[in-house]
Amino acid sequence: FIKYGFTKQEVSKAFSSLKLPQGFSNSEGLIFPAQYSFPQGISAQSAAQSMIDRFSDDPNGRKLLQGNKDFSAKQLLTIASIVQAESTNEDFSKVARVIYNRLRIGMPLQMDSTVHFIMQARGDIFLSRKSTTLNSPYNTYRKFGLPPGPICSPSSDAIKATLEPIQGDWLYFITVAPGDTRFTASFDEFSSWKVEYTKNRKAGAFK
């Protein structure tokens, strides 16, 4: 997008003058993930605006922008972004439920993806104990509640899972090995799985 046709300055200016949905002050999380094709000669601002508009064109995106009785549109987008960053499609709905369950009881979210966002290390598996102490409003290990905004642009599936999470009492989840993500309401069970995860990671299972 930037490399083929627009300068960095043009893109920066375009994103600073977008027409955003109500309740949003910047475009973070609103750039709908999709393949885009723009006609030759289109302005950077028009191209950027079409990417924002695509969000509300999506049925799930449009529903999210309406908010609900418990969360604003921005809060829902923030939740959806964490769901996207934390899991794969098959687990989106369960991860969303974990987030809601933790918020409901006032439990810190402690989502690794929010710390990876601070560190610009998305996709990492390992999170050091030291990194969980970083002083940032996005650090859900230190800060209760949701971070101040989205940490990525969620897919339509992640948005749908956020709006319609599966029922369950889970409070914890962990990927013990590639393709093996487990959910539980028991801290003791989670702790035993964490030991299993550590053994697998040290054995190179995540390489």
Model-predicted regions and their roles:
Residues T7, K13, S17-K207:
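Bacterial extracytoplasmic/cell-wall-associated proteins, especially those involved in peptidoglycan
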